[in-house]
Amino acid sequence: RDESESRGLGDVYKRQDLCISRPKSRLEWGIELPFDKQYVTYVWFDALINYVTAVGFNQSSENFKKWWPASYHLIGKDILTTHAVYWPTMLFSAGVSLPLSIFAHGWWLTGESKMSKSLGNVINPMDLIKDYGVDPVRYYLMREMVLGNDSSFTIESFIQRYNSDLANDFGNLLSRVTTLIKKNYDGVIPEPGDLSDLDLSIKKKGEALSKTVHQYVDDMRLNDAIEEIMQFIRGVNKYMEENAPWKMVKEDKDGAGRILYTAGEALRLGAVLLSPIMPNRTKTLLDALNVKERNFSWGILQAGTRIKSHEPLFPRIK
């Protein structure tokens, strides 16, 4: 971000008058200038206006008030001058509020190289979506990139992240919890009962999770927000291993039920927090737990609710 800020300020100091027209002799297409039919508008000038007209500027004042000014204007670092110099100048001159923040993100590289058609190293996201689904692709892109920096894509790192985070940690936890509930509790979510110290530790972390994640998102640290959620899920997997409800249920059914309720509630909370990134797979998880309410608080999972059958959430990639 510091590099982008420096570039933006540097461009302000060295910037001269900007020509916003192009002669039709050079450019046949474009919006004709109302005061000179021999010229059209420079594309970056008329294109920028779409940011405000699309949300109702000069058309719907209520809609415009709702959506503008933007909290964040997220752009690529290669078009920083256009958005950090030209665009604010246009808004100032029109008496329109500026975006509250302009954030320039980096590039996705193939290995160490910038993606280029001439080099033949372009990764087609539609091919990834076809093979692995849109939610895992969205998860990987959000998790791997530190916004503001460049990031490197390899199919090997994608598969490793998918199997580690999604298949092993998240998907496997759902499978364990729902399988044990179906087998030992007739498919009905058990009562949480009196919480042990370990249960209370998970609950305390769950109660603090939403605030931490929201702060990371506000700071545009999306990778850290996701990692915070996944650390919580990994902690719940460890909690399951330490308590072994599949063994405990033989002698202490209430105790095993308490553990499964806690793990199920952790899954619910994790799914709600990850739903903006993986709306489809998290909906599958919430449907499996028969949860309809999207709530960031702890204790929303209803004991006595019958869970539903579901396909494997994230089948491992071999």
Summary of predicted features, one role per range:
Residues 24-33, 40-41, 89, 98-120:
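Active-site and channel-lining beta-strand-loop segments
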Residues 2-13:
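Single conserved hydrophobic/aromatic residue that forms the stacking wall/gate
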Residues 107-200, 291-317:
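Catalytic adenosine-cofactor/nucleotide-binding cores of aminoacyl-tRNA synthetases and other
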Residues 215, 220-221, 230-318:
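Basic, alpha-helical terminal appendages of large translation-related enzymes
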Residues 65-75, 152-160, 214, 252:
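Glycine- and acidic
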Residues 36-41, 76-79, 117, 128-129, ...:
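Secondary-structure capping and boundary motifs in well-ordered enzyme cores
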